[in-house]
Amino acid sequence: MDTPSRYWLTILSSRINS
């Protein structure tokens, strides 16, 4: 299974960008 690190990073970035 792929690492959710990338997904988390994207979500975090989105939250910070917002």
Swiss-Prot record:
Induction comment from the UniProt entry of this chain: Expressed at high levels equally in exponential and stationary phase in rich medium (at protein level).
Name listed for the protein in its UniProt record: Protein YsgD
Domain of life from the UniProt record: Bacteria
